[in-house]
Amino acid sequence: MRPETIAIDGPAGSGKSTIGQALATRLNYAMVDTGLIYRLVARGVLDGAVDPDDREAVLRVSIGVLKGVTVARTDTGGVINVAGRPLSELRLHADDITRTVPRVARFEPVREVVRQIQRRVISEGPTILAGRDIGTVVAPEAELKLYLDVSLQERAARKLWAQSAEELRTQAEVELQLAGRDQMDRERETSPMRVAGDAVVIRTDKMSVDETVDIVVAMCGLELKAAS
């Protein structure tokens, strides 16, 4: 049976967003990249020179920034827009944003604002959501829950491959950064990262995006258009 909602969880750098978007294209689903939404909040905090440790101030920023988020459903799925621009096209991967994300994402009121957007998208049609607490908190009713399990070394290698010429980080530096983020996500008081009891765990160290998507498509029992 074709699932209406697919939850994809996993640690930082596990490929949730990439695989989720590829799967959304194959299935004609809307794709909600939770990480990008929190990055949008982090950018708002930085742009407004707001203290990321001030919960009430961060909440005000999140409400203001996320007010402009809309979903444009199409015949091929759906696009998350911010003030009329696709969320995926915004520049949200600067190092200062990356460092700020876990600090703003730890606040429960902020997470609830984000959850309201996620649940609204789910209510409007077939949706794929990628994050760290999708299957456990955001959409525990999702018909298909996935957890992408990737070694720290492989995640760091992927980050290194994708980094810009200006970054020039070493494998050890990236591993340390990812390990720190993993610890913060696991130990967060609000909605910590964990594997849902009914999630399918997929180890993707030696798998391509297309191979992973093919496995998920097979789980859905569907024959779909080949990846372009």
How should each PLM-predicted stretch be described?
Residues T25-L92:
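N-terminal phosphate/diphosphate-binding loop that engages ATP/GTP or pyrophosphate donors
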Residues Q118-E124, R132-V137, E141, E166-I215:
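Small-molecule kinase domains that catalyze NTP-dependent phosphoryl transfer to phosphate-bearing small molecules
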